[in-house]
Amino acid sequence: MRTLWNHFSTISYIKISPRMRRISAANLISNRNLSTISSTEDPELRDFVGFLESLKNYEKSGVPKGAGTDSDDGFDLGRMKRLMLRLRNPHYKYKVVHVAGTKGKGSTSAFLSNILRAGGYSVGCYSSPHILSIKERISCNGEPVSASTLNDLFYSVKPILEQSIQEENGSLSHFEILTGIAFSLFEKENVDIAVIEAGLGGARDATNVIESSNLAASVITTIGEEHMAALGGSLESIAEAKSGIIKHGRPVVLGGPFLPHIEGILRSKAASVSSSVILASNIGSSSSIKGIINKNGIGLCQSCDIVIQNEKDDQPIVELSDVNLRMLGHHQLQNAVTATCVSLCLRDQGCGRVTDEAIRIGLENTRLLGRSQFLTPKEAETLLLPGATVLLDGAHTKESARALKEMIKKDFPEKRLVFVVAMASDKDHVSFAKELLSGLKPEAVILTEADIGGGKIRSTESSVLKESWIKAADELGSRSMEASENKTVLGSLKLAYKILSDDTTSSDSGMVIVTGSLHIVSSVLASLQH
């Protein structure tokens, strides 16, 4: 194996193995200053975004060790409670569903929000990160908050925010201030219920100021190996941190499936605060994917039967046939089942308008940017990729890579594949690569870079990613792979397209898969706007 280095870009030539064809290390030098905030943000929000950017942003810099644990190293939840008190505790004015979990939070929250909306309820949803605009993080009734509404609220509470920052000696963070604004906006918009997604862990997350009195239910979707250092270094400590959102006397819906001892940790916490447990992966185990259909005006969907059974006698509580989910994969079916279980929990609490039909409509109308998202033919053509099939999926952990791999194997078993990958520096690059390479045989893997949280601090250099993928291939028995030059995310897409197009011996046009981070997805979607 020999590697040649150009002063401005990475050009690696590595011999090809029989099982793999190419890995391309793309050094994104000419696009390294791409920032989601600066390139795609609404110009009306300049003051608001500038205010937030003046604060400590852990999405950009990385989270300190142990910061998400319920320990002396954890974030100080007291300062968030004091901020909420200064804002007159807006989060006490409506019911809340609090959602935590390693993977599946965003999809589950979106499914649930749409189910409630289909039932006629006014719904607020707070999530992170955003893809194109910070407005996406705070939505009311299915739409991101408008710039004018956000500005009006910001200017009205700005003196309180400034006073709070001063009294907390500048320690309030970007996420804490934004969380306070979200809670305030939901009060202003008079929502019936808010679906609140935890940012990191649970116990010490800024969202964990919700009290039992207005908590409708807690939800823990999955437990996996992400943010390990910030959450204590083990699956057990991660489960402990996320179980911190379980509140006294309020039900908790567990997504899963979980390892038995991890489920035990969550159940133990629930028992200690007299919280009833609904295990979605158990009572929804009869749910299944029937096949993939191409629905006019919508695109690819997976047709599913969703069956939720009574835990005591296995009799169906909900039985929905041919539900067309717009996000693909068994993991998305599980997220839909989890959201359905939460909606049934709310129905039992008096939300009678959450009918079976509302559940169906809500599930079928849910789509999220960067989650099993296929570009339309027009979007592909806009990126100068005419006729290409392009899948955007923000998978960035071993577990989400496995889910992506299984979806591709099941739904597109004969497709020729090229991956375009960029990742954050705090992810397990080798494990991610091994998951994708262990069950798939891509024509090429093109490695590039994308800004993380609007900055470069947490972005992984493509040359580092290249070494991780080579190591993964070596551990799987593929000795070496060929690499070629590229500089930008868009250039990487064009190279992927060229690799697939140049093979005239195949009638299959292939598929380009953009993955490794929601931030590389953001780069692609931002390009469509320009």
Curated annotation (Swiss-Prot):
Domain of life: Eukaryota
Phenotype when the gene is knocked out: Defective embryos with development arrested after the globular stage, at the transition to the heart stage.
Protein localization: Mitochondrion matrix
Transit peptide: 1-33
Residues bound to Mg(2+) 1: S128, E197
Residues that hold Mg(2+) 2 according to the record: H227
Tissues/organs with expression: Expressed in seedlings, leaves, inflorescence stems, flower buds and roots.
Gene Ontology MF terms: ATP binding; dihydrofolate synthase activity; metal ion binding; tetrahydrofolylpolyglutamate synthase activity
Protein name in the entry: Dihydrofolate synthetase
Organism, as annotated: Arabidopsis thaliana (Mouse-ear cress)
Gene: DHFS
